[in-house]
Amino acid sequence: MVAASKSVDSIRFCAKHGFIPVYFMQMDGIVKNAHIYVEESEKLGRKMTLGQNQNIVRWPHICESELDYDRKLAEYDLDIYKNFYGPFFPQFNQDPNTDWVQNMKESGIFIGGTVEQSIEQWQEIYSKVPAEYITLIWHYAQNPKEDVIEELELFMTHVLPKLEVPDFI
């Protein structure tokens, strides 16, 4: 797996070598790069289905309510989002009046809400790019382990079964 940026060259490199690109980006970038990956693979004689051999990364929270989702973002993710991720991205918002929880939601990398909302969001993602692989990230040091285990269990038992995933074999 190769962490892919918005660089088309990195996607072409992954396709050329059969590497799995890992998409840490908003959906529009994933869609663009997923199509490039398929096209480049086919130029090299490897028939690929959209999403095949590709990995989408998301930071999930499956919660009891939208308010609970906002709370978890603020308590478990905000510090790392602002102070760790921020320095890596020069375009990162520097306005001190920013509504950071809303900013995190709009970033496209966090996904969540109730089970039903999570299913809808993942179905929307998979309607555009049904990725063969998913990486789910929790800031484990900030999240109570019980929350992480419960959210992963909810994802595996309620969300994942609702996704239409092609048979990539």
Task: Label each region the model flagged.
Residues 1-4, 21-24, 52-58, 132-138:
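Hydrophobic faces of well-ordered beta-strands that scaffold small-molecule active sites
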Residues 25-27, 137-148:
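Glycine-rich, proline-tolerant flexible connector loops at the mouths of alpha/beta enzymes
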Residues 30-131, 164-169:
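An alpha-helical appendage that flanks or caps ligand/catalytic pockets
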Residues 63-66, 144-154:
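Short glycine/threonine-rich loop-to-helix capping motif typified by GTGT followed
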Residues 7-9, 28-29, 61, 140-142:
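Short, solvent-exposed loop/turn segments at secondary-structure junctions
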Residues 153-167:
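Alpha-helix-loop-beta-strand connector modules within alpha/beta enzyme cores
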Residues 8, 12, 16, 31, ...:
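Amphipathic, non-transmembrane alpha-helical secondary structure
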Residues 2-28:
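A conserved active-site cap/scaffold subdomain adjacent to cofactor or substrate pockets
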